[in-house]
Structure formats: C-alpha cells, structure tokens
C-alpha cells in the first residue's frame, strides 16, 4: 500500500507499528470500536453541494480528559445537533492533539495523530488487526522542548503533485510556529502576533496554502491563511468581532463543496456548539448555529477523527 501520510510513515509508524513503544503504562489495549467506525464514516460525508443538499454533514470528535481516558462524540448537523457518545477507553494523558487520521490496509486499520505529553511531541498510533475491536496504542517520541506550546493543529494535503503535511503550534511567547515532520519535527517558519489566540483548528488545506480558524480571548473569530512557501507570512482576516470568546477547543470537518462544520467547546460549562461556516470571506462569511449539546465527557483536549485521504478541508 502506498501511504500518503508521509510524516507519520517517516516517523517509523506503520499499520504494524512494531518499532514503537507505549507512551505510558496502561496505554495499550483500549476498546473503542466506535473510534474505528467514526474514522471510516468520514469517507461518506457530503463533499459536493448536491450531496450536502440531501445528506446531513457531520463531524467526529475525539477527546481525552484529565485522567487520560479517551472518548468523544459523533455529531450530525441537525437542529438541535444529533450527538452519539464514542466508547471510552484508557489512553494516556495528553495536553494537546492534532487530527487523528484513519488509514486502512485490507482488514487492518490504524489511527495516526500528533500529541503533546508534558514537554514532548509524540506521533501516536492506534492499530486494529482484522475484526478486533481492541486496538494496540503506541507512540514514537519525535522531540522535546514543547512545554511552551498549548495548541497544535495540522494540515494533510494529499491530492495533486504538491502534497504536504505541516504541524502548527501556538506558543506561549505569542508566536505561531510551522513544522515539517519526518523522524523529528523541523521548523519551517514562525510568525509573531498571536498572543491573543485562545483556540485554533484547520479549515482548508490546498496545494498553495493552509487556512486556520482561530478564536481570541476577546471573543473575535479570525482566519489565518498561511502560504506553503517559506518564509512564513500568514494573512490574518477578521470574520467576527465578538461572540466566540468562551471556546477553548475547535474541531472542523468539511461540509459540502466549500463549507465547514465546526464544533466549538466551552471547557467551563462543558458545552459543545455546532456551527455551519460557509467558505471564509472575512466579515461576510456565512455562519449558522445548529445549537449546543452537553459535552458530558468533560475533556479539555478535542481533535478531529477523519480519514487519511480526506475529506480534504476546503473552507477558506
């Protein structure tokens, strides 16, 4: 099988993952069949306007709470939102996580994602063999010195001639950093001016740029378009001046041809709110709320569960 998840393949992770080691004791042998199902369901989400007109959009959100237990939500864009809780299992403690991607080879499946644990960056993998409902969870350490980062997200552009995988990190010094990842994370630029950012997620990945959606402590909502070229020169555009200050976690999935389904989480009230966000055009961007739900799992870390080959996010 040709694997386009270049970053994690280069890190030594495969569907077998024989060289990896557990992150902590108790990290192996969870039992989350619904995580596997959530990753596979991403391939059936509407990616055209015609499909979105007849089928509801959705987003699968993984989560890890303070005890290192994994859970999450499978969310359908109805009003109010239709929410199914994902099975919980003992994982390991993480401070932040990128997207987790599901890749399949025959009857075997594996989820891959980047996580922060303490001051370290890990590439984690949960692999399922055959019909097993219990994955083996392992991780490979990619580097130390990450204690100053409080948010990470990533892009995974897998179509066309200019494929790329970038990891973005928000640092306490107020800068946004970009990394390429192989056997380690290597800097590919940074930009100051992001000290007010509270939460971020990726809404677009293309051959020439990535687009992040961020909230600020003052409640504003912005897009940050980052050309894939170096040096890193992000373009920041205001979407809304207020109304988004309570959200500490954002998770985005493609909805139709150019839109985004956004799950925003308030950690203080344990509420999740679902928004349909049209293609980002600054203050004229269409945003519709589907309402809120009680995020009863109580996690502080949320991340997208999706397929390794998409849906490709195209919302900005």
Task: Please provide the spans of the model-predicted regions.
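Secretory targeting and sorting signals
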Residues: 1-29
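C-terminal region of N-terminal signal peptides and the immediate post-cleavage residues
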Residues: 18-65
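Hydrophilic extracytoplasmic domains
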Residues: 28-30, 256-316
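Repeated scaffold domains used in trafficking and secretory/extracellular systems
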Residues: 42-58, 85-112, 140-163, 193-209, ...
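Structural motif
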Residues: 58-83, 109-134, 164-166, 173-180, ...
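Short N-terminal edge-element motif at the start of the domain
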Residues: 127-186
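Predominantly a core beta-strand signature of beta-propeller blades
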Residues: 135-139, 184-188, 235-236, 283-287
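Short helix-loop boundary/capping segments
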Residues: 177-248
């Amino acid at each position: 099988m040709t694997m386009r998840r270049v970053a994690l393949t280069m890190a030594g992770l495969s569907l077998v993952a024989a060289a990896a080691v557990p992150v902590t004791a108790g990290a192996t042998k969870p039992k989350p069949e619904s995580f596997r199902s959530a990753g596979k369901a991403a391939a059936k989400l509407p990616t055209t306007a015609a499909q979105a007109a007849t089928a509801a959009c959705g987003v699968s959100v993984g989560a890890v709470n303070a005890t290192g237990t994994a859970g999450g939500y499978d969310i359908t864009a109805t009003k109010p939102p239709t929410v199914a809780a994902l099975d919980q299992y003992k994982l390991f403690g993480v401070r932040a996580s990128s997207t987790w991607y599901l890749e399949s080879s025959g009857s075997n499946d594996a989820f891959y994602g980047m996580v922060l644990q303490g001051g370290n960056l890990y590439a984690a993998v949960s692999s399922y063999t055959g019909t097993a409902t219990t994955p083996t969870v392992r991780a490979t350490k990619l580097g130390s010195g990450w204690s100053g980062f409080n948010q990470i997200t990533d892009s995974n552009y897998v179509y066309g001639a200019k494929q790329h995988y970038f990891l973005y990190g928000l640092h306490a010094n107020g800068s946004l950093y970009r990394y390429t990842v192989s056997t380690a994370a290597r800097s590919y630029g940074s930009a100051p001016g992001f000290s007010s950012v509270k939460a971020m997620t990726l809404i677009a990945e293309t051959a020439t740029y990535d687009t992040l959606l961020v909230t600020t402590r003052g409640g504003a909502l912005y897009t940050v378009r980052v050309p894939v070229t170096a040096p890193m020169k992000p373009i920041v555009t205001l979407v809304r001046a207020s109304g988004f200050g309570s959200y500490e976690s954002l998770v985005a999935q493609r909805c139709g041809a150019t839109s985004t389904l956004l799950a925003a989480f308030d950690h203080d009230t344990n509420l999740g709110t679902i928004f349909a966000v049209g293609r980002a055009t600054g203050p004229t961007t269409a945003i519709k709320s589907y309402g809120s739900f009680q995020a009863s799992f109580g996690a502080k870390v949320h991340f997208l569960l999706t397929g390794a080959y998409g849906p490709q996010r195209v919302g900005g």
